[in-house]
Amino acid sequence: MKPSLQVEFCGHIYENPLMNASGVCCMTTNELDDMARSSSGAFITKSATSMERDGNPEPRYVSVPLGSINSMGLPNKGIDYYLDYVLDRQDRFPSENPPFMSVAGMSIDENIKLLHRIQDSNFRGITELNLSCPNVPGKPQVAYDFELTDQILSSVFEFFTKPLGVKLPPYFDFAHFDAMACILNKYPIAYVNCINSVGNGLYIDVEKESVVIKPKDGFGGIGGEYIKPTALANVRAFYNRLNGRIRIIGTGGIKTGQDAFEHLLCGATMLQIGTELQNEGTEIFERINAELLQILEQKGYQSIEDFRGKLRSIS
């Protein structure tokens, strides 16, 4: 019998675990429709702010040999644009899973207002709160401030009752894994997304003796193959620390079916693809699904749950 890539996530059944990372192929309704027609299991909107944002000056995204560097600055069409889209799609395709919604306020108050808009709407899908954008000048990554993160989540769950996940930055210290997991376990969070890009990297054009992006003197978030070991470590660390009801989306360095398998083996249930989706287009989902299925067949697994989270240690 052929293996299945079907996964259950936050009360929804998806035909496979793949989706776009917020920021790629999700800015406009045309791009979101392209995602809907693709072989991905799900898709997510661009991280929305209260009003439309142009983002940082260009050049702000550059593909580099093992990934990408970006300092986009949260360009988006605003919450009303994306909420209108998901509600319209929800009405037109009632038997389908709604898209994920992503929000990223520029302040605590803005995050609360954005989530109130979603809570007060008829949206039946899953929302992702981005607490980890490293590319807005003058704005720190919220999720590196543990006390502030705790305060935000406490305020959010006073009113928000729909499924809510949190997108996290990468952590590099066991004490930080412990501290953040302790906070997350206090709240009815549906999932965590590990990880956003690794913030404030630098890539240099040696011929020009110059940085390659304009914002922040060339400092930007690193994505792609560079960050896969860090992403896997974060997925695994949180899988081992979070209570069983909190699921994990693995994001970072997924280019092949083997990369996807590794994220799932570490404990992820869904997978987001950013850099390689930007490079290859939506055809990447069909390819990675096929490669992942082939791995399951070779290993004799019938489903993702046969191996998810079962990474072995060396005794």
UniProtKB/Swiss-Prot annotation:
The record lists the catalysed reaction(s) as: (S)-dihydroorotate + fumarate = orotate + succinate
Which annotated residues bind substrate? K46, N70, S71, M72, G73, L74, N130, N196, S197
InterPro entries for this protein: Aldolase_TIM (IPR013785), DHO_dehydrogenase (IPR050074), DHOD_1A (IPR033886), Dihydro_DH_chainA_dom2 (IPR023359), Dihydroorotate_DH_1 (IPR024920), Dihydroorotate_DH_1_2 (IPR012135), Dihydroorotate_DH_cat (IPR005720), Dihydroorotate_DH_CS (IPR001295)
GO cellular component entries:
cytoplasm
Active-site positions, per UniProt? C133
- Taxonomically, the superkingdom here is Eukaryota
Which positions are tagged coiled coil? none
Q: Which cofactor does it need?
A: FMN
Top-level class of the enzyme under EC nomenclature: oxidoreductase
The enzyme's E.C. designation: 1.3.98.1
Q: Where can this protein be found? A: Cytoplasm
Single Gene Ontology BP term?
A: 'de novo' pyrimidine nucleobase biosynthetic process
Keywords of the record, alphabetical order, are: Cytoplasm, Flavoprotein, FMN, Oxidoreductase, Pyrimidine biosynthesis
Q: Which PROSITE patterns match?
A: DHODEHASE_1, DHODEHASE_2
Family matches, as Gene3D superfamilies = Aldolase class I, Dihydroorotate Dehydrogenase A, chain A, domain 2
Q: Which residues bind FMN?
A: K46, S47, N130, K167, I195, G224, G252, G253, G274, T275
Subunit structure comment from the entry? Homodimer.
Task: Tell me what else is known.
Answer: K.lactis has two isoforms of DHODase, a cytoplasmic isoform and a mitochondrial isoform.
Protein name as it appears in the record: Dihydroorotate dehydrogenase (fumarate)
